[in-house]
Curated annotation (Swiss-Prot):
Recorded GO MF terms: D-amino-acid dehydrogenase activity
Domain of life of the source: Bacteria
A GO BP annotation: D-alanine catabolic process
Gene for this chain: dadA3
Function: Oxidative deamination of D-amino acids.
Protein name from the UniProt record: D-amino acid dehydrogenase 3
Keyword Flavoprotein in record: yes
Organism annotation: Mesorhizobium japonicum (strain LMG 29417 / CECT 9101 / MAFF 303099) (Mesorhizobium loti (strain MAFF 303099))
EC number: 1.4.99.-
Keywords annotated in UniProt: FAD, Flavoprotein, Oxidoreductase, Plasmid
Matches recorded under Gene3D superfamilies: D-Amino Acid Oxidase, subunit A, domain 2, FAD/NAD(P)-binding domain
HAMAP family xref list: DadA
Catalytic function, reaction form: a D-alpha-amino acid + A + H2O = a 2-oxocarboxylate + AH2 + NH4(+)
Length: 412
């Protein structure tokens, strides 16, 4: 059977490996970190959120970015230091504003399809990932924010999502722990949350049982094409060369550099997000911390309940290149917001984290073929990697099956 090497063991890479195994391929996954899901997929917001499918390509996003440029605690922060990569990405971002509606609807449809795939995989493989299926509540503080959400809701509905408007008086019935003087909100009962790292680890085990090999601490440094691909990886000690019939690039923010080895331009920019994981204490946590996931549109902050003992709070977007620094002035707003929205939640024990979202300028993942035969991409999912990966991986596996059919290789 054809041998496929998947580069990257985050949510996109592990999901791709699983989809290819389902097709019958011999799969090896190469990851530069020591374990699966140690970068973008380690401690993100935890939402499986079709309701968050609105792409960012809108003039309001541009205006907010300019307005907030001098605020170190702003939800959207842009480092003004000149960078050709950053500015070229921003120009492409603006050029895709005309596709805002079309891409939002398509993302919604993709997210709904992905949900079905992911739930089926988790059930089939018995993956425990602190899954909570209580929906997502979007909250808005003023009329302008709510009116924009009404327009977004039309697109989400056209994409097939049931997201209904709710009044502040209805909030208590949805999530009693929530505090605030809101204008209105939208509730999506079909959305859910969970621990993406636990899901990836469980899916990695499922892939291993199905015959996949995972090679860690192995950074791809060179790829050569002879009769087959020779993939050279730097490991502890001597370099290791893998031979493959096909390659799938799922390398997150590193995908841009890998793509350049094939002469492809994948204009991914690393957009940093932050999170805190609040360690909940005692039986009172059940009533003080939310079980329903919250998305505060003004603050750009989300919550996910990860079992009885943890609450994930995440958000913000920072354009600052490849930078994993955890800044106190970016973590502090998450802690302050948690105290404001859930005053009975103790925040003495929080674990901060920062990760880089692999963002394409059009906010759509790159799924499909390279200009080089036998090379494929499933990358650039941005802030919706977990929400979309199960569907894009199934799509990619179908493309691979067309280009590298198993029967043809066996016949050869």
């Amino acid at each position: 059977m054809p041998k496929i090497v998947v580069i990257g063991a985050g949510i996109a890479g592990v999901s791709t490996a699983y989809a290819l195994l389902e097709q019958g391929y011999d799969v090896t996954v190469v990851e530069r970190r020591r374990y699966a899901a140690m970068e973008t997929s380690f401690a993100n917001g935890g939402q499986l959120s079709a309701s968050n499918a609105e792409v960012w390509n809108h003039w309001s996003t541009v205006l907010k970015g300019i307005k907030w440029m001098l605020r170190r605690d702003a939800p959207l922060l842009m480092n003004p230091t000149p960078s050709w990569h950053k500015y070229s990405w921003l120009l492409e971002f603006v050029s895709n504003i005309s596709r805002y509606r079309e891409n939002t609807i398509e993302t919604t449809r993709l997210a709904i399809a992905a949900r079905k795939h992911l739930f089926e995989i988790a059930d089939r493989e018995g993956i425990d990932f602190d899954h909570v299926r209580r929906g997502i509540l979007h909250v808005y503080w003023d009329k302008d924010g709510f009116d924009h959400a009404l327009k977004v809701n039309e697109m989400l509905n056209e994409g097939g999502l049931d997201r209904r408007s709710v009044t502040p008086s209805e909030f208590a019935g949805i999530e009693p722990a929530l505090h605030g003087k809101f204008y209105g909100g939208f509730y999506t009962p079909s959305d859910s949350t969970g621990d993406i790292h636990k899901y990836c680890a469980g899916l990695e085990k499922a892939c291993t049982k199905r015959g996949a090999q995972f090679i860690y601490d192995a950074a791809v440094t060179r790829i050569e094409r002879r009769d087959r691909f020779n993939i050279v990886c730097a490991t502890d000690g001597a370099d290791q060369t893998l031979v493959a019939d096909g390659i799938v690039v799922c390398a997150g923010t590193n995908s841009r550099d890998i793509a350049a080895m094939f002469g492809d331009r994948i204009n991914i920019y690393p957009v940093k997000g932050y999170s805190i994981t609040v360690e909940l204490d005692g039986a009172a946590a059940d009533s003080s911390a939310p079980w329903v996931s919250i998305l505060d549109d003004r603050a750009k902050i989300v919550t996910s309940r990860l079992g009885a003992a943890r609450l994930r709070v995440a958000g913000t977007a920072e354009f600052n290149g490849v930078n994993f620094d955890i800044r106190e002035d970016r973590i502090r707003p998450l802690v302050d917001w948690t105290r404001m929205m859930f005053p009975k939640v103790a925040t003495e024990h929080v674990v901060p984290w920062a990760g880089l979202r692999p963002m394409m300028p059009n906010m759509m993942p790159r799924v499909g073929k390279s200009r080089v035969p036998g090379v494929f991409y499933n990358t650039g999912h941005g802030h919706l990697g977990w929400t979309l990966s199960a569907a894009t991986s199934a799509m990619l596996a179908t493309v691979v099956a067309t280009d590298l059919p198993i029967d043809a290789r066996l016949a050869a």
